[in-house]
Amino acid sequence: MNQTLLSSFGTAFERVEHALDALREGRGVMVLDDEDRENEGDMIFAAETMTVEQMALTIRHGSGIVCLCLTEERRKQLDLPMMVENNTSAYGTGFTVTIEAAEGVTTGVSAADRVTTVRAAIADGAKPSDLNRPGHVFPLRAQPGGVLTRGGHTEATIDLVTLAGFKPAGVLCELTNDDGTMARAPECIKFAQQHNMAVVTIEDLVAYRREHERKAS
């Protein structure tokens, strides 16, 4: 990642800390991966605190594929089958079947309905019957070990919300440009600044976690 673009957001460790602070304050975070991977920026929010307004922003400026990042434990709790048995996608993204809240929604498409679905899926006592399948929210299963196991936006989301003190569940969506193309780092950073989001890279988070685990050992 071009460090010049990121310099105004501090060092790698400062960027992670700023991201955690943003989540604790109920704000979003722009998570960038490497140029030689997807080369994309994802807007992420803690599932517990995401507002209808934030969901609307995500739908308006994102790819439209609003994803709910979950742990394997939560996936099993909700009895969500993986979308395919043999995942042949380029980066092995862990999509499950799509979901909709069983109660409290209309068509499931609106920002309010999608937030209702997210809330239903992450509730402490959530059970499979609380969700209909298919739906308009796309759960993603994170790999155990987070970004130290797989350097994806899914794992970064779970790591960040967990480090910030929330349940291990977060919402993400890729940022797109107005013409429908994928936003790259310069556009992602500009968008984050306009919408009071922190900016962090997956590389930052890997370094941060490794250092903290080294100190703890």
From Swiss-Prot:
Binds 2 divalent metal cations per subunit. Magnesium or manganese. Mg(2+) 2 binds at E38, H153. The keyword Disulfide bond does not apply. GO terms for cellular component: cytosol. The record marks H136, E174 as: Essential for catalytic activity. One of its GO terms (biological process) is riboflavin biosynthetic process. PANTHER family: 3,4-DIHYDROXY-2-BUTANONE 4-PHOSPHATE SYNTHASE (PTHR21327:SF38), GTP CYCLOHYDROLASE II-RELATED (PTHR21327). Mg(2+) 1 binds at E38. Its cofactor is Mg(2+); Mn(2+). D-ribulose 5-phosphate binds at R37, E38, D42, R150, G151, G152, H153, T154, E174. Pathway: Cofactor biosynthesis; riboflavin biosynthesis; 2-hydroxy-3-oxobutyl phosphate from D-ribulose 5-phosphate: step 1/1. Homodimer. Disulfide bonds: none annotated. It comes from the Bacteria. GO terms for molecular function: 3,4-dihydroxy-2-butanone-4-phosphate synthase activity; magnesium ion binding; manganese ion binding. The keyword Cell cycle does not apply. This is 3,4-dihydroxy-2-butanone 4-phosphate synthase. InterPro entries: DHBP_synth_RibB-like_a/b_dom (IPR017945), DHBP_synthase_RibB (IPR000422). It is an enzyme of class 4 (lyase). HAMAP family: RibB. SUPFAM superfamilies: YrdC/RibB. Belongs to the DHBP synthase family.
